[in-house]
Amino acid sequence: MTTSHASHPDRLLPADPGTRDIARRLLAHVEDLPIISPHGHLEASMFVKDEAFPDPTSLLISPDHYLTRMMHSAGVDLADLRVGGHEGKSAREAWRIFMSHWDLYAGTATGYWVEQEFEHVFGINAERLNVGTPEHADAIFDELTDILAKPDFRPRALAEQFNLEVLATTDDPLDDLADHKALADDPTFSPRVLPTFRPDAYTKMYNAGWAEKTTKLIDTAGDGKAGWEGYLQAMRNRRQYFINHGATSADHGLHDTDTTPLSHKDAQKILDKGLAGTATLAEMHAFEANTTYRFAEMSQEDGLVMTIHPGVYRNHSASAQKKFGADIGADIPFQMEFTNGLRPLLSDFGENKDLISDSSFNRWLRTVSLGSTQDADMAAASNLAANSKMARQNTRDILDAVSDGGVMLGRNGALVLGPVVGTLHIKFIAPLNKRVERVMYKTGLSEAAAAEQCALEDRLREEMAHALYQWNPGRDENYDLVINTGSMTYEQIVDLVVETYARKYPLHVRIIPNGKDQ
């Protein structure tokens, strides 16, 4: 019987007993749900070929730069770990090296992850990792080799066992996405494998091969246009191609947060210099900043979610990159400034209601600024500043709360529900039978299971409010307005909210009849 902490049901849960109890219930609520992975680096071809993994080293060590860079920092040659296709050492010898250096991973997230793999995927006691002799390493290597040869450990079978529902890959804009299509057309494979548009190779002039790749992009997808116009057209076309193959997002690994746009003339000038190999480093970064801005612009048009992760010096070791290739663990973060860098992008696109979404917790505990020094900044309904983007957003906020039950708190919550000027605290009570019906419809649960889920959500919400904000959301006297949403139409509820705010703060709101400015 295993005694490894990796098998303990409370691993990683809080030490405080009361908080741990809440965490246990939260975990029980979600741990068996399907996996929806919006970002990853697996290849779609893995599931098309569905081949057995060759050996433990090729699967678990050589491609994992979190593992290899730790050993490299202790003097292990990456070639001995078979990184970048090097085969100086056998897979078995590389495994022995890993096992003999296991002490390096004590207390690290990487070590914890490997222990979880051993315990919960392979069924091997993780404590056996602590014995690093060659004989012991060989025994585990042979066990894993036998396990990986089983049909249950091929990519498709693992995807089903892990309850993988959606997996987003990361793909070059010129990828033909044939493997994604093959999977989408295969009725025997239930997970959805979606491509993600990753244009970094065409935005970073300072990377090797940029000019050749960019020329090919324009020639292939630019609709016959040249230069900067061809570049933009090619990107639009390939984004649409990805969307047609199921893509929902575009992923951008940025050098920094600069999003300053360039004029067409300046962009063309830098593009020409980049293709000729004469652009300065400052011009290269300006070009990348401009493309980030343009991709945000495109996201407003085609709906691809834009994800960015800036502030990492990729492939910091030039010698390691030359010998082993890119992405082998030589990435180093550097200090970032977000406010000024993202300002051009957010100034032009940040008010778009579809650009930034919020969490389900925020949909319950609203931090909507219901009121300020400006006229109609409350903007909660169509008869208040009908053309205001804030009006539309606050209207959606109220609709969410009406549908799900919960609380809307003005002026960043005013967390203690105190008498802060300009706030309005509202509680919506969604009838339990309606909530249960909604859960049954969305999840397919039975009525009893749906009712249990609603009850659990209510308990967790109340406990979270107590733990985080020291207040009881169930006490109606804490609110300016309490509404049973089953007794009124949505329009009536919005009107009541607006009227209540107008009565409480008559100087803050100007009622605009029929939604027209006067």
Swiss-Prot record:
GO MF annotation: an example: glucuronate isomerase activity
EC code(s) of this entry: 5.3.1.12
EC class of the enzyme, as a word: isomerase
Pathway: Carbohydrate metabolism; pentose and glucuronate interconversion
Record-level GO BP terms: D-galacturonate catabolic process; D-glucuronate catabolic process
Any matching Pfam family: Cytidylate_kin2
Record has rRNA processing as a keyword: no
SUPFAM superfamilies the UniProt entry points to: Metallo-dependent hydrolases
Catalysed reactions listed for this entry: D-glucuronate = D-fructuronate; aldehydo-D-galacturonate = keto-D-tagaturonate
Alphabetically ordered keywords of this record: Isomerase
Covalent S-S links between cysteines: none
Highest taxon in the source lineage: Bacteria
Family affiliation: Belongs to the metallo-dependent hydrolases superfamily. Uronate isomerase family.
Name of this chain's protein: Uronate isomerase
Organism listed in the record: Corynebacterium glutamicum (strain ATCC 13032 / DSM 20300 / JCM 1318 / BCRC 11384 / CCUG 27702 / LMG 3730 / NBRC 12168 / NCIMB 10025 / NRRL B-2784 / 534)
Gene: uxaC
